[in-house]
Amino acid sequence: MKLNVVNLPSTDSPLRKSPGFAKKRLSDYALDILGLCEYGCRYCSSNAGNFLRIRREQFADATEEQLGKRLYPSSDPTLTFHWPNVLAKLEAMLDGKRVDWGEGRTVVFSMLTDGFSPSLVADGTTRRALELVIARTGLRIRVLTKNACVGSNDWIEFFKRYPDRFVVGLSIGTLDDAWSKRVEINTSPPSQRVK
């Protein structure tokens, strides 16, 4: 399925405190590297939730300007919002912090969207963001994704280099590949995620 990619100005703070997850003791911080992931899940709160609803018309204006038509996340599963300068923003946020900053704390990667969206994995954005956090902080990284690529030899070797820094999970809403294709439009099939 061809994606409709819209580039938006990056958030000024891709790495931020995560009070909701902190209460649940899941993470202290959240790192989101794109505005809307590529999976088009019908049930996703990022597709129809407050984060995008507040800016609904701004996003529709951007789709019209860049794609020639008004599109909304809740009605178009091919729509994704990228932040082209997110790595520069992350680097700027980490400048001046001590290398041990965040030791004993956890960052969830990503909270609102999936940082392992296929195009970000392919162009190296995902790996570079994780490398920045590893090199410039003491944070543990909690990955939750629907992309089966985290089980590939390449990614397993990457995670193994930092065994005390990563907790990696695959989200599975169903074991039925056909149902998943209707509801989690562009994700890795569940049968690939459970291998």
Please identify what each model-predicted range represents.
Residues R182-S188:
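Short glycine-enriched, charge-decorated loop/helix-capping segments at active-site entrances
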